[in-house]
Regions:
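Membrane-interface junctions at transmembrane-helix termini in multi-pass inner-membrane proteins
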Residues: 96-97, 150-181, 221-227
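Alpha-helical transmembrane segments of polytopic membrane transporters and translocases
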Residues: 32, 49, 66-84, 111-112, ...
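Membrane-proximal transmembrane or re-entrant/amphipathic helices at the cytosolic face
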Residues: 249-303
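Helix-terminus/linker motif at the lipid-water interface of multi-pass membrane proteins
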Residues: 38-79, 129-138, 196
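Membrane-interface helix-loop junctions in multi-pass transport and translocation proteins
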Residues: 1, 60-63, 173, 180-215, ...
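Helix-loop junctions and terminal segments of transmembrane helices
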Residues: 73, 77-103, 107-113, 163-168
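Interhelical loop/hinge segments that connect adjacent transmembrane helices in multipass membrane
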Residues: 1-44, 94-104, 224-236, 280-288
Length: 303
């Protein structure tokens, strides 16, 4: 309503000259997005439903209690999804308007974007225990759900990015089928993983379910626009993050040190991509000081 009033959108509505062909194209493009969004909701909501129904009485807690802890576990991974939403809003216009060298453009932006997300994910997993203790002390046990929910949120951000390939090619039905595949597989995995591993199994199911969507969309993006996600690099990052998550959950001696070292390894491995984004943002945010900082770091790297 606010946008309608401030933008005077009624000036752009012409009821007399209705273009039926354009109307049909818009419907074909937009209608599949509704069940696709519902499928995304199913992936998140099914976790809570399965945990509530299957974990009642586990360790003396009701199903509602476990469901509440799982909801609290989303607290830190929300940082990633918020970052992804901000980026997607800024990126969407460029994705549509950039026509020359689109494959190279998408590949370059994804590499930088994924580098930032991988570093953030590693930091969240490493620090989730102390942060949950300070911020959500009454729900401290919820930290167990954070590691794989963070991995799931990373996949969700990637899926949102790759959805741009469907927008560019007006192939929204592919968005529906990929999300539907993720939703169905997530429900199936929820049932088995929760039986095997308890409520933490729901977070693993979310990671694998959204991971399936990511793989399908990466293949589509490659076929549609020639984009490459550099699968070896992405698999290595996810492998290290999964290892960090498992280490944190297993709690071996000095687990904080080992997870910290893995976080440092992720940051070093992705530093080039992170610095590429920082080089663009720092001058805009800090002005002259930002340019001086960029110059100093560039000189240090060259040495």
């Amino acid at each position: 309503l606010f946008l309608c009033i401030t933008g005077r959108l009624w000036n752009y509505v012409e009821l007399k000259g209705l273009n039926r062909d354009l109307w049909q194209q818009m419907l074909r493009f937009s209608l599949p997005m509704i069940p696709a969004q519902i499928s995304f909701w199913v992936i998140n909501a099914s976790d809570l439903f399965f945990v509530r129904e299957m974990c009642g009485g586990l360790d003396g807690h009701s199903g509602d209690a476990w469901s509440g802890l799982l909801s609290t576990g989303y607290f830190l991974p929300t940082i990633l999804t918020t970052l992804g939403l901000i980026f997607y809003d800024a990126w969407q216009l460029s994705a549509v308007t950039e026509e020359e060298g689109r494959a190279r453009f998408f590949t370059k932006i994804f590499r930088t974007y994924s580098s930032v997300l991988f570093c953030c994910a590693a930091g969240i997993i490493w620090l989730c225990r102390p942060v949950m203790h300070v911020m959500k002390a009454n729900y401290y046990y919820a930290w167990h759900f954070v590691p794989f929910l963070t991995l799931a949120s990373t996949c969700s951000c990637f899926n949102q990015f790759l959805n741009s390939a469907y927008v560019v090619n007006k192939k929204s039905t592919h968005s529906l089928w990929t999300m539907l595949a993720g939703a169905v597989s997530n429900c199936i995995m929820n049932y088995f993983f929760i039986k095997w591993w308890g409520p933490i199994g729901a977070t693993v199911a979310s990671f694998f379910g959204l991971g399936i969507v990511f793989v399908l969309r990466a293949l589509d993006a490659h076929n549609m626009i020639g984009m490459s996600i550099h699968p070896g690099r992405v698999a290595l990052n996810f492998g290290v993050l999964a290892g960090e998550a498992l280490l944190l959950l297993a709690e071996p001696p000095l687990y904080g040190l080992w997870t910290g070292l893995l976080t440092a390894a992720i940051i070093l491995f992705n530093f080039a991509g992170v610095w590429a984004m920082a080089r663009m943002l720092l001058p805009k945010l800090l002005g002259r000081r930002g340019r001086a900082l960029v110059s100093a770091v560039d000189n240090w790297i060259k040495k």
